[in-house]
Design a protein with these regions (language model features):
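Bacterial N-terminal signal peptides that target proteins for export
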Residues: 1-8
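Bacterial N-terminal signal peptides
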Residues: 8-17
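Predominantly soluble domains enriched in secretory-pathway, periplasmic, or organellar proteins
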Residues: 18-368
């Protein structure tokens, strides 16, 4: 190849890379918070989809009207939220229905009910399918994300509750709150092909790393978490929080209901409802090592992270700087009232369209 052609090719690659960086750097980063996201309590943000500007101190931007009302016209508690950059849509489940909204027009495209109700769902990376758990019952529905129609049903008899789609789109992780086993479904066949566990008790919130080799699970009765090897299906470790006692909790009946990996997978953050704290663990060692704790404004029941790993978002509405461990903001609505929710997702906009979406779960994103 002639030198000038080589240089020209390099220049094109560099310009392309710069353009991609500029598009990402110039993106408007917004946090979408679904309400009511603490049971059906309206005092923590009312009803709707609240939008906050991440780069402007998490300032309140707007409230988008949503559906999800019961027969008396009162808001049902939100169970999950998921969004797709591929389709520009956002989905909200309540105890009875799932609603699909167009993010650009902010219009409701459809709302559908499913036999057995709904719980915390997960969407495929291409935005085409959603795995929707029934409300603590025996099955998951696999749903066409464009139409809301049911494609098939997966029966686990586990008290279906929480769902994570693997980043590669090949596996979906299905946790029921009446089973000590984490079920894993193959997304090509929509069948459970393997499990991880058993863990010491029924699984509550959980997370997985990017390579899908490890899972970290909350279980009933434990102030702490357990670690599972996804490859072998075996439980590896049990980690109990040191220096704090278990006690009564406002919700969930579980000492630790919320766990997440920082995107770089260097840390694991764990909720502690009774003590109104987040406990931080070094996840570069096994088992993860407890390193510090952060006091929050209320009892946390969930935690996730910004895509860049700079902020942690416990359900209390505190915004925590991951590096300094300091609370740097608190979510507030248009009236100045404190906002809390266990259902939130980060969405990036550029050129009038959605270019990237986060996840309601604090999943690992470390590139291998």
């Amino acid at each position: 190849m002639k030198p000038w052609k080589l240089l020209s090719g390099i220049a094109v690659l560099l310009l392309g890379s710069a353009s991609m960086r500029s598009a990402e750097d110039g993106a408007r980063r917004l946090l979408y918070v679904a309400e009511p996201g603490i049971r059906n309590y309206l005092e923590y943000g009312g009803h709707g989809l609240l939008v906050f500007d991440i780069d402007q101190g998490h300032r309140f931007v707007k409230r988008i009207p949503t559906a999800g009302l019961n027969k008396e016209g009162k808001p049902l508690n939100v169970k999950g939220v998921a969004a797709s950059a591929a389709t520009g849509r956002i989905y909200i489940t309540t105890t009875e229905t799932m609603t699909c909204l167009d993010l650009k027009t902010e219009k409701i495209l459809w709302e559908k009910g499913y036999p057995g109700g709904c719980d915390r769902m997960a969407i495929s990376p291409d935005g085409k399918l959603i795995y929707v758990p029934s409300l603590e019952k025996e099955h998951w529905h696999v749903v066409d994300a464009m139409t809301g129609d049911v494609v098939t049903k997966i029966v686990t008899n586990s008290g279906s509750h929480n769902t994570i789609y693997g980043l590669d789109g090949k596996s979906v992780y299905l946790a029921g709150l009446r089973s000590p086993l984490l079920s894993i479904a193959d997304t090509r066949t929509h069948t459970v092909t393997r499990t991880v566990g058993p863990f010491a008790h029924s699984i509550r919130p959980f997370t997985v790393n990017a390579s899908q080799t490890l899972c970290f699970v909350n279980i009933n009765e434990l102030l702490g978490f357990e670690v599972g090897d996804i490859t072998t299906g075996k439980k590896l470790h049990r980690v109990e929080v040191q220096g704090f006692e278990k006690g009564p909790t406002k919700r969930h009946g579980c000492p630790s209901h919320g766990i997440g990996l920082t995107p770089d997978e260097r840390e694991l953050w764990l909720t502690d409802a009774h003590n109104s704290r987040i406990h931080v663990f070094d996840a570069t060692v096994m088992p993860p090592k407890q390193i510090t704790s952060i006091l929050l404004r209320d009892q946390p029941g969930w935690v996730t992270f910004s895509l860049d790993g700079r902020y942690a978002y416990p359900s209390t509405g505190d915004v925590v700087d991951v590096k300094s461990r300091k609370i740097v903001a608190g979510l507030k609505d248009e009236t100045g009232a404190e906002v809390q929710s266990e259902k939130m997702v980060e969405i990036h906009w550029s050129g009038g369209r959605v270019v990237r979406t986060g996840d309601q779960f604090g999943v690992g994103r470390k590139a291998r």
